[in-house]
Every structure is written in C-alpha cells, then in structure tokens.
From Swiss-Prot:
Species: Helicobacter hepaticus (strain ATCC 51449 / 3B1)
Name assigned to this protein: Acetyl-coenzyme A carboxylase carboxyl transferase subunit alpha
Domain CoA carboxyltransferase C-terminal: residue ranges: 36-286
EC number: 2.1.3.15
InterPro entries: Acetyl_CoA_COase_a_su (IPR001095), ClpP/crotonase-like_dom_sf (IPR029045), COA_CT_C (IPR011763)
Gene: accA
Cellular component terms per the entry's GO annotation: acetyl-CoA carboxylase complex
Native organism taxonomy: Bacteria, Pseudomonadati, Campylobacterota, Epsilonproteobacteria, Campylobacterales
GO molecular function, one term: ATP binding
Family to which the UniProt record says this protein belongs: Belongs to the AccA family.
Catalytic activity: N(6)-carboxybiotinyl-L-lysyl-[protein] + acetyl-CoA = N(6)-biotinyl-L-lysyl-[protein] + malonyl-CoA
GO biological process, one term: malonyl-CoA biosynthetic process
Domain of life of the source: Bacteria
Compartment(s) of residence: Cytoplasm
Amino acid sequence: MATYLDFEQKIKNLQDDIESAIISGDNDAISILEKELEKEVSSVYSNISDYQKLQLARHPDRPYAMDYIESILKNPYEINGDRHFKDDKAIVCFLGKIGEQTTMIIGEEKGRGTKNKLARNFGMPSPEGYRKALRAAKLAEKFHIPILMLVDTQGAYPGLGAEERGQSEAIARNLQEFAKLKTPTIAVVIGEGGSGGALAIAVADKLAMMQYSIFSVISPEGCAAILWNDPSKIESATKALKITPIELKKCGLIDDVINEPLIGAHRDKESAAKAIESYFLKAFEEISQDDNYLNKRYQKLMNYGAFS
C-alpha cells in the first residue's frame, strides 16, 4: 500500500476516488477525476517547500541503494568485509556492468523491514563499512574501473564501539583516499546526505543530487535543538540550513541535480533508476575523455568554502 505524506492528502483522496470509480465502471467520473488529480499534483509539487522536500527524502517507500543496484547493475558481484574486523551491511559494494561499462557501485543501504533495517543498522555505517568502501574503491582503481557512489544515510553510527574502532579516522581516511583515486568517480545523493557519514563516500569528480534529496552538516531536528532549544522548529531549521539540491548548486557545492518523476522517485522507481544510469554514463564519458580530471577534482575540492 502506498504511503502518503501530510501535504499529499488531497492527492490520496483523489486516487482513492479514481479507484472507486474504476470498480463501479463510471468512465465519465474517471476522466474528470484524473484531470483533477493531474491539476492537484502539478499544484502541490510546483510549490513544494524545503521541509516537504525533507519529508520526501525520508519517505519510507523511497528507492534505496539496493533498489537502484538491482535495477541498473548487470551481473552483480558483491564485495564483503573490510579485511580487518567484520562486514558492515550498512555499506554495500557491488562490481558489475551498467550498460556495457564495468562499474563498481558503493552505496549506503538503510534496509527494508524490521529485520533487514536492524541488520543494516538503519543505514548508519560503522568504521568497517567505510573501510570496506575504501577496499572496493582501491580494487576499482587497480583496474581503472569507474565508481558510482550512492549516498543515503542520516549519518555515521555514533555508538561507543564505532568510536573505539576509529570512526573519525575511517571517515577522514576515505576523504583523503577518495580524493586521490586514479579512476573516474561519480557520487549521487539519493535520499539523505547526513554530515561526515555521507561525505565519506561523496568525494568525487562529479557530485549530483536527486531532486528531492538533502545534504546537510546536521539534521534539521538537531539544528533546531541546538539553535533554538526547540526541536519543533524543524521547518525553520530546514530552510536556514539550505540543504536542498537547488541551494547547494547555487553555492557550488554540487555539480548537478537529477530530476525525479513529478511526485518523487518512490512513485516511479524504474524511471528514477534510468535517470541515475543515464547521468552516470554521461558523466563517466565526460570524465574519461579529460586527461586532466584528477587535477580538476583536486581544484574543485580546494575551492569548497572559498567565496570572492
């Protein structure tokens, strides 16, 4: 059953009415209701607020990394473990083909269903997850295989064990090593891009965001609690943080925005997957034809935070 957000209630009601009209065989009513639905969808999504985009980024039906991997990667071969401690299921690494291009995909996976979510720690990676990602990236570099990174986490796991095993070192190491990888790298924020937990697999030649994704140094709830001592001020915090793709592109922090189906990737996962596949192949072709891409990546990273 589809999940609707609070601002989509009228859309839900119209779709329910259409289903009832279909059951009763009232073709005239179906035609009228479909036009009303199209008008309502256009009205709602053409005036969507930053807070509503946050809700869409967190939508429970939104495609996760594994959804995209299963859709766009042919002949997938999974890489497990960091060769130091364990296999962190919050990070997934697969080697396969996108189109005819051999590709390494590294993604953050939140999981579906209670058991799977617990196994994947709700998409919050531990140090061994980031070390597994680096292991996969180094393997790709060895054979000059392009890397596609799918970013989707509320943040790195803040537990005591993760800190004891070097969470901050693992993130910092990835920032350093991914910046130097001698192979084309493309990162796409597909849902939530939460602070260092997202950055650890987001250093790339091209950094894009899905239309209804977010990227932030802190959650809006955390920001509201710190600045106003009131977590209920989440809407104000969301706007102030400028966490949406449009705002981040204006600031020069991301390269591109990937358009989603009108009412979100969760309503048409196949189209969303095709959009990511198309973006990756186009970006890879552009990067691979540029002999100076490593220097351009370095210059891009050095320009972060610089304003004239």
